[in-house]
Amino acid sequence: MSLRDRQFREEPSENALPLDRNHFRPSTEYDQSYEPLEASGQSGDSDLVSEYAQGNMSVTVSEEELRHELSLLGFSYVPRQRLLEFKKDLERLMNRGSAAASPETSRLENESLDDSTNTPPPLPIETSAWHQTSAWPTTTSTSSKEWDNQQRNQDSYTKHTVSLGGNVQATKKAPQITRKVLRRKSDGQTHVSDESFLYSETETEEEDTGSSIVDFRSESSGRSSASCAKSFIRPPLYSLLDQYRQRSDPVGRYQEYKQKWDALQGALERNRKELRWGIREQMMSAPPQPAARSVLLPNTYVIPTDKKRYALRWAVRRDLVNGVMPRGSYS
């Protein structure tokens, strides 16, 4: 007889089930039948243990605890209707996870069958299993292995997920940080690369053994995460020192500018030569223009000796030379 059975025999718990095999099963959320224990194919002890494991593992979560944990995760305001829906789904997942713990139940049944006494060992009763659903690790010192160990020890809805066949499977993956990077190739095409931190091949094989969990994170890249190669940051084609030298090299920059200027001057000189040769060809091909001849016009200039007072002035001059006194009038 084990030490647990002795303690239970000496100090029976208030939650211990009656040992009468003809009693009826209590009405629970998962079992609504009222058949005697004798009608089942198994023995009474195993039925008592399985009944105790299924009936008392029904967990509930209060709204205060749910709001407190959501506030720790960053969701400060959640509507009451959405909170009630989330609470209902959470309790359903917790109860399903508790019912899926079949190895522990089978071990307890084997121990009860091997013992000579009919007293089943007491099982711990949890009124609330919300404390088992901890938030994501907030410290950077926590490694992925510690997170995996912590997830192994936990027995809550965070440890289970729904597979393709509807079975409940345990996952031990730590949260991944996915970063999409848009890179441009030399030919002008763009390529989206995934630089998330992926698991190693051994860890992926251990986690995916016996499970068919659907991974929706690789739908954007068109291939599953198992076939996705490890991403890497492409090294630069030249170092930063070469970039600095290329920027601050005055001689190289002068040579580059000189080559560009010479190429530009050659193009301009070629254009000017073509223009000059075109003008010269036009001048050589055109006939000579005749010289313009001036038109002779009659001279309309009047000589001063032909004026009207010329005769009068000449008479006065003649009289003055000869000493003749002028007369009153010259007619």
UniProtKB/Swiss-Prot annotation:
InterPro entries: Centriolar_ciliogenesis_assoc, HYLS1, HYLS1_C_dom. Its main location: other. Residues 1-12, 184-194 have a biased composition (Basic and acidic residues). GO terms for biological process: cilium assembly. It is found in: Cell projection, Cilium; Cytoplasm, Cytoskeleton, Microtubule organizing center, Centrosome, Centriole. Disruption phenotype: Morpholino knockdown results in a specific loss of cilia, with no effect on the number of cells with multiple basal bodies or the number of basal bodies per cell. It comes from the Eukaryota. GO terms for cellular component: centriole; ciliary basal body; cilium; cytoplasm; non-motile cilium. Keywords: Cell projection, Cilium biogenesis/degradation, Cytoplasm, Cytoskeleton, Phosphoprotein. Residues 1-48, 96-157, 183-227 are annotated as: Disordered. Plays an important role in ciliogenesis. Required for apical targeting/anchoring of centrioles at the plasma membrane. Belongs to the HYLS1 family. This is Centriolar and ciliogenesis-associated protein HYLS1. It comes from Xenopus laevis (African clawed frog).
